[in-house]
UniProtKB/Swiss-Prot annotation:
One of its GO terms (molecular function) is hydroxypyruvate reductase (NADH) activity. It is found in: Cytoplasm. It is an enzyme of class 1 (oxidoreductase). This is Glyoxylate/hydroxypyruvate reductase B. It catalyses: glycolate + NADP(+) = glyoxylate + NADPH + H(+); (R)-glycerate + NAD(+) = 3-hydroxypyruvate + NADH + H(+); (R)-glycerate + NADP(+) = 3-hydroxypyruvate + NADPH + H(+). Pfam families: 2-Hacid_dh (PF00389), 2-Hacid_dh_C (PF02826). GO terms for cellular component: cytosol; plasma membrane. The keyword Signal does not apply. The gene is ghrB. Catalyzes the NADPH-dependent reduction of glyoxylate and hydroxypyruvate into glycolate and glycerate, respectively.
Length: 326
């Protein structure tokens, strides 16, 4: 008899068939109260869980007594209580490698669109404001040869540094607990303190995950140390930046502009002051949102779950210590 799993996000048909080759698949659209009775019944027998979003905490896990593995179709896993999973011996799988290049593309797009005011000026053209030769009130700022600072020199940070260094001749600064030899050798990246980085960079690019240590890592004190011409880019997690402090800094000219793919609350409320600021490019958490990458993420998550439930995991496990307990 095949193990039972719960799938709570639509995936391409061929990937669904791959799951069905190994498991009895109970499919749901999200983890909501709309499907609560059927979902609760399926969870009682489920050995595997695959999807994205939703809060997977202690209370949820108590409804899934047979669960052995959870596979998220994402690199981030801050919606999972990792400690609770680990205590129950449940492996948590994620997709850290397949979205690297696409997220780096998104970050570079935010750098360019914020610096050159692409979104704002496109809207002005559509509104009929382009009536003559443009003046300096339509001008942006250069990207090439400007200094980029990267908070989070992991896979995505490295891919962003590659684009900045080779594509735009940008000096690269970064902060980390340990030197990143590959970044320094390939891109001439310079490791420095956060204060030094904030003071020197023209573009502050954040790729950090949300943890207790990174929560509001960039607040009013840090923003005040930046150049008034600096642009902040966040494609990590929204709460890494104190959003109210950022709004104030953008309103009073402490910094020049921001390109944001992530927010404190998502979806971003329509009444957010960020949406009223012309110096903000706000996009709806599209970091990995291409057809190709989202397919690859789902495929990776499927393979991850199969590996976790067949004892063949070699990578992508958030809490690998539970594999040794099995």
């Amino acid at each position: 008899m095949k193990p039972s799993i719960v799938l709570y996000k639509s995936i391409p048909a061929d990937l669904h068939q791959r799951l069905e080759q190994h498991f009895t698949v109970n499919s749901f659209e999200g983890l909501s109260s709309d499907n609560q009775p059927e979902l609760l019944s399926a969870l009682q027998q489920a050995e595997g869980l695959i999807g994205s979003g939703g809060k997977i905490d202690q209370a949820f896990l108590e409804r899934a007594p047979k669960l052995r593995a959870a596979s998220t179709i994402s690199v981030g896993y801050d919606n999972f209580d990792v400690d609770a999973l680990s205590q129950r011996g449940i492996a948590l799988m994620h997709t850290p490698t397949v979205l690297t290049e696409t997220v780096a593309d998104t970050m570079m797009a935010l750098v360019l669109s914020s610096a050159r005011r692409v979104v704002e000026l496109a809207e002005r053209v559509k509104a009929g404001e382009w009536q003559d030769s443009i003046g300096d009130d339509w001008f942006g700022v250069d990207v090439h040869h400007k200094t980029i600072g990267i908070l989070g020199m992991g896979r995505i940070g490295m891919a962003l540094a590659q684009r900045a260094h080779f594509g735009f001749s940008m000096p690269v600064l970064y902060t980390s607990r340990r030197p990143h030899e590959a970044a320094e050798k390939r891109f001439g990246a310079r490791r420095c303190s956060l204060d030094t980085l904030l003071a020197e960079v023209d573009f502050l690019c954040i790729t950090l995950p949300m943890t207790e240590q990174t929560y509001h890592m960039i607040g009013p004190e840090q923003l005040a140390k930046m150049k008034s011409s600096a642009i902040l880019i966040n494609a990590g997690r929204g709460p890494v930046v104190d959003e109210q402090a950022l709004i104030a800094a953008l309103q009073d000219g402490t910094i020049h502009a921001a390109g944001l793919d992530v927010f404190a609350q998502e979806p971003l409320p329509v009444e957010s002051p960020l949406l009223k600021l012309p110096n903000v490019v706000a996009v709806p958490h599209i970091g990995s949102a291409t057809h190709e990458t989202r397919y690859n993420m789902a495929a990776c998550a499927v393979d991850n779950l199969i590996a976790a439930l067949t004892g063949t995991v070699t990578e992508n496990c958030v809490n690998p210590q539970v594999l040794q307990q099995a």
